[in-house]
Regions:
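GST-like domain detector, emphasizing the conserved glutathione-binding G-site
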Residues: 1-8, 14-82
Length: 82
């Protein structure tokens, strides 16, 4: 299942979250708190992507990882929206 790292007040994250919910695409939410103390989820984000930037998508079924809300939405649109 797709995992998406999102921060609560990030407008780009809201854009991805709203898109996923409108399209009914299931995903695992990985909540990230930016600017605060390092958390296990934030450490995982940095380990996987190399930086603490959100939104960040991980699709283990296709071995795809990416940043950038527009790229994430285009990817989901191409591979998961029916």
């Amino acid at each position: 299942m797709i995992e998406i790292f999102l921060a609560e007040r990030c407008p780009f994250c809201v854009k991805v979250r709203v898109f996923m919910e409108q399209k009914g695409i299931p995903y695992v939410l990985k909540p990230v708190v930016l600017g605060g103390a390092t958390s296990v989820v934030k450490e995982e984000l940095i380990r996987l992507g190399g930086k603490a930037q959100v939104p960040y998508l991980v699709d283990p079924e296709r071995s795809v990882r990416m940043y950038e809300s527009d790229d994430i939405i285009a990817y989901i649109e191409e591979h998961y929206v029916r």
